[in-house]
Amino acid sequence: MGISYSVDVDSEASAKAMLRERSISLKHSKAIAREISGETVADAKEYLQAVIDEERSVPFKQHNSGVGHRNDIDGWDAGRYPEKASKDFLKLLSNVSNNADQQGFDADEMVIEHVAPHKVGESQGRKPRAMGRATTWNATLCDVEIVVTETEEVTA
């Protein structure tokens, strides 16, 4: 049984990749996915590297209570620099670029058509407490899928 994606795409004009069971925040992943969707692969890589370097922030349009305001976001105020999730998204973009190159496409010019994070479970953990007790301390696991397609040239 193969890996299933949440969208059906034409394999002749697209490439896809997936991160499996990564210990990253689902909320951060959703915010990053919303921001890079529709961008070219090269632009998305540049953006994520700027997020890691804390030069540009990711707008948090959901789950944003208590999130500080950033002045580099146009049309929005709340944002953060989710470094851990951004590094995993860079790995995902590198993977989909390699898949696109293998299929004969120019990877950096392809457009991100679909990117979706999904919660797939929790990694069980325990945190020791006083008197020999322990509290569960679980980590969320996420899958992230991405599909890139060729840009269609518009002739005027």
From Swiss-Prot:
Protein name, as recorded: Large ribosomal subunit protein uL22
Family statement drawn from the similarity comment of this UniProt entry: Belongs to the universal ribosomal protein uL22 family.
Designated gene of the protein: rpl22
UniProt keyword NADP, yes or no: no
Iron-sulfur among keywords: no
Molecular function per GO: rRNA binding; structural constituent of ribosome
Binding partners and assembly: Part of the 50S ribosomal subunit.
Record's GO cellular component terms: cytosolic large ribosomal subunit
GO biological process, one term: cytoplasmic translation
Keyword entries, A-Z: Ribonucleoprotein, Ribosomal protein, RNA-binding, rRNA-binding
Record's function text: This protein binds specifically to 23S rRNA. It makes multiple contacts with different domains of the 23S rRNA in the assembled 50S subunit and ribosome.
Cystine pairings recorded for this chain: none
Pfam family, one: Ribosomal_L22
